[in-house]
Amino acid sequence: MTNKKLKSVFIVDDSAIERSMLTDHLSKNEGVEIKEFSNGESCIKEIVMGNVEEPDLILMDYFLETSPGSQSDGLEVLMKLKEICPASEVIMLTSVSNDKIKELAKNKGALDYVVKSQISYQQLDDVLQKHFS
């Protein structure tokens, strides 16, 4: 991937606290537009309906809460997002460090996989610096 300037980020996480913390952290980057979504369906719907432009980056929780019949599984949403906006990069966020899930997410199109923890913001900054500088 060619490094490009990060201009727009979508945050998809069922935790309002996580979304808020990520938004606060990413807001330190000048000129970055951030939109929050509490589930994968709302993010996909907004893109498909043309209500939002495709983002440069989507930060998405791997374990999204779902309702019965929902399509919010992180990998399913990842595959759909890569189908409808292939130029957008997706970084999966999760509270569980699991090499099998990490590899599966990357095989399905995720740019990277960051484990949520006290040091995850530094890891996230490192990934963003690597790909969007």
Identify the residue ranges that each predicted region occupies.
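Non-catalytic signal-transmission and effector/linker regions of two-component phosphorelay proteins
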Residues: 1-10, 15-23, 121-133
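Short acidic/polar segment at the start of the alpha1 helix of CheY-like receiver
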Residues: 15-19, 66, 101
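Two-component/phosphorelay signaling modules centered on CheY-like receiver
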Residues: 16-37
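Acidic, metal-coordinating helix/loop segments flanking the phosphotransfer/catalytic sites
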Residues: 36-57, 61, 65-66, 123
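Short amphipathic alpha-helix used as the core "switch/output" element in two-component signaling
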Residues: 69-86
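Short, conserved "switch-loop" micro-motifs in signal-transduction and mechanochemical regulators
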Residues: 96-97
